[in-house]
Design a protein with these regions (language model features):
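A short hydrophobic beta-strand element
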Residues: 83, 97-107
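Hydrophobic/aromatic beta-strand elements that line small-molecule binding cavities or substrate pockets
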Residues: 73, 87-92, 105-107, 122-128
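Short beta-strand edge/turn micro-motifs at domain boundaries
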Residues: 120-149
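Short, cysteine-centered beta-strand-loop-beta hairpins and adjacent loop/turn segments enriched
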Residues: 78-80, 107-118
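A short, structured loop/turn motif at beta-sheet edges
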Residues: 92-100, 127-134
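A solvent-exposed, acidic/Ser-Thr-rich amphipathic alpha-helical stretch
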Residues: 44, 48-94
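Positively charged n-region of N-terminal signal peptides that target proteins for export
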Residues: 1-4
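Short, low-complexity N-terminal intrinsically disordered segments enriched in polar/charged residues
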Residues: 9, 14-50
Length: 149
């Protein structure tokens, strides 16, 4: 009987340990999203691999699914030479199958006419595990300040 209890305890602990998320895993997935958004490497098929099918992004007062967001990105890429995001001040909340992160995003965009746009956002992302893989389900972006030079 004691051996059975020990076996069940160890099995339960191993299952709980292997199923949980870490802050590093969640932050890494968020950073991967922004790396895949870089205009130099952006491909819709690649970014969709880390998104749920019902992914939504709320930005600039609009709600977009990935198809709509892709259209926006394609149009923006016609006048944008480079994109860069600096994420910081992560606040992470986790459970076994989901993660929520709020963070600061400082973005720099260089346009074809030489303008440099500096944007400061407060953002939030919700991620869920699907078949053991962490994916982005929802992203909220609130522009705090924008400066054009």
């Amino acid at each position: 009987m004691n051996k059975l209890l020990i076996f069940l305890s160890v099995t339960f602990c191993l299952n709980a340990w292997s199923a949980s998320l870490s802050e590093d895993e969640a932050i890494s997935k968020l950073n991967e999203f922004f790396e895949l958004l870089d205009l130099k490497v952006y491909e819709k098929d690649n970014i969709e691999k880390i998104l749920t099918e019902d992914f939504k992004i709320f930005e600039m007062g609009k709600s977009w699914n990935m198809d709509e967001f892709d259209t926006f990105l394609q149009e923006a890429s016609e006048t944008t030479i480079s994109t860069d995001w600096d994420l910081s001040e992560y606040r992470v909340s986790l459970d076994d199958n989901s993660a929520h992160i709020s963070y600061v995003n400082n973005g720099t965009f260089v346009n074809t006419d030489g303008e440099v746009i500096y944007s400061y956002w407060l953002e939030s992302v919700y991620m869920v595990k699907e078949q053991g893989v962490l994916k982005l389900k929802f992203l909220q972006s609130d522009l705090v300040n924008r400066e054009v030079r």
